[in-house]
């Protein structure tokens, strides 16, 4: 599985997921800096107020 792993508005980068991980995620939230976006492998739990999208195809979390 290959997922994007860049933060917010950085240039696109990818990572190859290890350990049999078969999903990618994109988390979005707002704070005093504005909208923050985090991407990576897996499908982590999130706290209230954080939007999470999980998907199961290569590079699906842009």
Swiss-Prot record:
Domain of life: Eukaryota
Keywords: Acetylcholine receptor inhibiting toxin, Disulfide bond, Ion channel impairing toxin, Neurotoxin, Postsynaptic neurotoxin, Secreted, Toxin
CDD domains, sorted: TFP_snake_toxin (cd00206)
Region listing for Disordered, in residue ranges: 1-20
Places the protein is found: Secreted
Cysteines joined through disulfide linkages: 3-24, 17-41, 43-54, 55-60
One example GO MF annotation: toxin activity
Principal place of residence: secreted
Protein name: Short neurotoxin 2
Organism: Oxyuranus scutellatus scutellatus
């Amino acid at each position: 599985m290959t997922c994007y792993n860049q933060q917010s508005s950085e240039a696109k980068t990818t990572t190859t997921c290890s350990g049999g991980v078969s999903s990618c995620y994109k988390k979005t939230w707002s704070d005093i800096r504005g909208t923050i976006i985090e991407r990576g492998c897996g499908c982590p739990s999130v706290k209230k107020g954080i939007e999470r999208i999980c998907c199961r195809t290569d590079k699906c979390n842009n």
